[in-house]
């Protein structure tokens, strides 16, 4: 920072990957789920494990922004931790652009997607099950993705954006991808992409 003819450096906090405090929730939740979750039915064990990993990773992303010195208020922080599915804390805590407010058509599309997914999940799957159990499993999975990832999670993104928060949609129209890299890197499951870019990938 420079002013009055003099310059000074400002120490910026950095996120330490090796800090045990930052990784402790993920470790505890993961170990506890692996140790005690197998007594649950397989489908419930899967959901509990997914929730444990999600909460642990959410905490790591939250800690990064705390270390960088975010100016977000308590309400915004709690909203990111417990009211949003994404992992991009920097965008969530930043000031939103008024032009990013969602359009009414986006709400309609999300609601329609939930309806289509519900039909696949609770009606079509039952009929397909009598013909081919494997196909029924895939049909149910597609229906669930429509209901959750393209439907409910997108509605949640729209609600936050309507409130002036930069909540990037989890699915960003993946069918519009012009390349495989764009599909996986920018449009499909942006929460996972943020995790991979932050903790796995490193610039060459």
Language-model region placement:
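Hydrophobic/aromatic-lined pockets within catalytic cores
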Residues: 61-64, 156, 160
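Membrane-interfacial catalytic/cofactor-binding modules of polytopic membrane enzymes
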Residues: 150, 157-204
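N-proximal short alpha-helices
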Residues: 25, 29, 132, 153-157, ...
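Non-catalytic, membrane-anchoring transmembrane segments at the edges
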Residues: 1-2, 7-149
């Amino acid at each position: 920072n420079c002013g009055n003819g003099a310059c000074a450096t400002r120490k910026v906090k950095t996120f330490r990957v090796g800090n045990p405090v930052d990784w402790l929730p993920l470790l505890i939740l993961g170990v506890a789920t692996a140790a005690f979750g197998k007594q649950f039915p397989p489908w419930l064990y899967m959901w509990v494990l997914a929730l444990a990993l999600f909460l642990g990773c959410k905490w790591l992303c939250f800690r990064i922004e705390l270390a960088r010195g975010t100016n977000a208020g308590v309400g915004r922080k709690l909203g990111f931790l417990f009211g949003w599915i994404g992992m991009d804390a920097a965008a969530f805590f930043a000031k939103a652009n008024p032009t990013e407010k969602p359009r009414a058509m986006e709400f309609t599309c999300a609601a329609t997607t939930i309806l289509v997914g519900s039909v696949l999940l609770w009606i079509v799957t039952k009929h397909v099950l009598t013909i081919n159990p494997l196909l029924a499993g895939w049909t149910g999975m597609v229906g669930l993705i429509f209901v959750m990832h393209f439907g409910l999670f997108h509605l949640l993104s729209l609600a936050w954006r309507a409130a002036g928060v930069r909540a990037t949609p989890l699915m960003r129209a993946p069918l519009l991808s012009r390349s495989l890299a764009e599909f996986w890197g920018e449009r499909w499951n942006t929460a996972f992409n943020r995790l991979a870019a932050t903790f796995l990938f490193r610039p060459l």
